[in-house]
Regions:
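Intrinsically disordered, low-complexity activation-like regions
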Residues: 1-218
Length: 218
């Protein structure tokens, strides 16, 4: 089995030409590489020796992420699912605000991003991409759910995660985290919020009546 760092970002390769284009894939790879650097530094495996160079690199990656075009700015046919592209782009922005380009939580940015992501997902909840890419949806919903902590949007994320995780037959957090680690995920920064969210998801499972985003079986 690959190590967590080796798995990081692998999930995006399966989305090329469907949910992301080459430009987005390049940005997400840069974010993956940056995450690996941060992880190795925090675990003492390879401390960052040149903090100025690291900050410059981080700023370049963030600028590239924020410069990605919106879904409605893409050329026709550039991706098969504009809905999936936009959802992934916004989830990556949430991740950057927490990990690669951290912003203070009291600034209200996480609630704003969680609300924007929820609106995108609601607008395209019948898109067939969710049946085709349920694991990407899992990652998107977890990041949105973490960002929605202590907001009214939290319940929406919990309900949808309960449905998607049930469809994927995921009941243990460790199995969920393994799936998340194939995209953008830093355990030291995301694990705490993820576990809290998962407790709420499991509590909601017995009350699951419908899958809001249309994932019935995978």
């Amino acid at each position: 089995m690959n190590s967590p760092v080796e798995r990081l970002g692998q999930g995006f390769q399966d989305l090329l030409a469907f949910g992301i284009n080459d430009s987005a894939a390049s940005v997400f790879q840069a974010m993956t590489d940056l995450t690996a650097v941060i992880d190795c530094h925090l675990r003492g495996i390879k401390p960052i020796s040149d903090i100025v160079a690291f900050i410059d690199r981080r700023n370049v990656v963030q600028h590239s992420l924020m410069s990605l075009p919106r879904g409605d700015e893409l050329n026709y046919g550039e991706v098969s699912s504009v809905c999936l592209y936009e959802s992934i782009r916004h989830a990556a922005i949430i991740y950057s605000a927490a990990v690669t380009f951290p912003l203070p939580p009291h600034a209200g940015v996480f609630r704003m991003l969680a609300t924007l992501l929820q609106n995108i997902l609601e607008e395209c909840k019948f898109d067939p991409c969710w049946q085709l890419c349920p694991r990407a949806l899992l990652w998107i919903l977890v990041l949105g759910g973490i960002a929605s902590f202590d907001t009214v949007e939290r319940t929406w994320y919990v309900q949808n995660l309960a449905a998607v995780s049930a469809a994927l037959n995921l009941s243990e957090w460790e199995d969920v985290a393994e799936e998340l680690g194939k995209y953008l995920w830093l355990q030291s920064a995301c694990e705490g919020g993820g576990r809290l969210l998962w407790v709420e998801v499991l509590s909601d499972r017995p009350h699951l009546e419908e899958n809001i985003l249309g994932i019935s079986e995978v």
